[in-house]
Amino acid sequence: MRCLKAVVAFFTALPVGGAELDFSCIWATPYLAGLMVGGAGGAVYFLTHSPAAAYAALLLATGLHHLDGLADVGDALMVRDRERARRVLEDPRRGVGGIFAVVALFVLAASARPESWLDYIVTDLYSKALALVVAAYSKPFKEGLGSLFIVSAKRQWPAALPALAVAAWLHPAAFLAATVLSLFFYVAAYKHLGGANGDLLGALLEVTRALYLATVDLSTSLINGLF
């Protein structure tokens, strides 16, 4: 129970009293935190039919934690030197790269109109599952929460496969496109930084989620146009 509380405390904005840092149940991230965060977005979409409001609910449900990682990585990618780029990750000030990354991602996800409110749950299951699998094959460039996550993921990543299978079964074209584009982003940033940390994994979560929503919308529109 303690490790499950830690998953909720780390990946959502829900107040969890007495939660301690414990990644021994990191396998549950897609199914526990994913359902909670995705459920928040899905509920808002069901009530309002507004993609922007639904995506904002997703972000607020995470406490904007991963969005901050995306902004940090966006700034770091603007710096060519690896050591300077790593230092930029720790800088709380925002540069043009971080601002652009956040705005572009919000516009992409907020303009996507999925088939159903359930797609918000699926996209969060998928994004967290993909991050878990990718982390298992990554190397941290520094000690911290990211390195602890990576070490735990190396033992537990197979548990994420059912969540990926659900996303692939429901929207195969969107799954393929979002996965390829997300991995392209991750590999480019990983090589630039010489490894991974919590910011990069958080950025991957946000990028994957937005891309899946956008590609679900696009693939659905194309299929409806053809038939």
UniProtKB/Swiss-Prot annotation:
Catalytic activity: alpha-ribazole + adenosylcob(III)inamide-GDP = adenosylcob(III)alamin + GMP + H(+); alpha-ribazole 5'-phosphate + adenosylcob(III)inamide-GDP = adenosylcob(III)alamin 5'-phosphate + GMP + H(+)
Entry cofactors: Mg(2+)
Localization in the cell: Cell membrane
Record-level Gene Ontology MF annotations: adenosylcobinamide-GDP ribazoletransferase activity; cobalamin 5'-phosphate synthase activity
Topology term for the membrane: Multi-pass membrane protein
Superkingdom of the organism of origin: Archaea
Transmembrane spans: 3-23, 26-46, 95-115, 117-137, 165-185
Record-listed E.C. numbers: 2.7.8.26
Pathway: Cofactor biosynthesis; adenosylcobalamin biosynthesis; adenosylcobalamin from cob(II)yrinate a,c-diamide: step 7/7
Alphabetic keyword roster: Cell membrane, Cobalamin biosynthesis, Magnesium, Membrane, Transferase, Transmembrane, Transmembrane helix
HAMAP family hit by this protein: CobS
Family from the record: Belongs to the CobS family.
Role of this protein: Joins adenosylcobinamide-GDP and alpha-ribazole to generate adenosylcobalamin (Ado-cobalamin). Also synthesizes adenosylcobalamin 5'-phosphate from adenosylcobinamide-GDP and alpha-ribazole 5'-phosphate.
Name the UniProt record assigns to this protein: Adenosylcobinamide-GDP ribazoletransferase
Annotated organism of origin: Pyrobaculum islandicum (strain DSM 4184 / JCM 9189 / GEO3)
Gene name for this UniProt entry: cobS
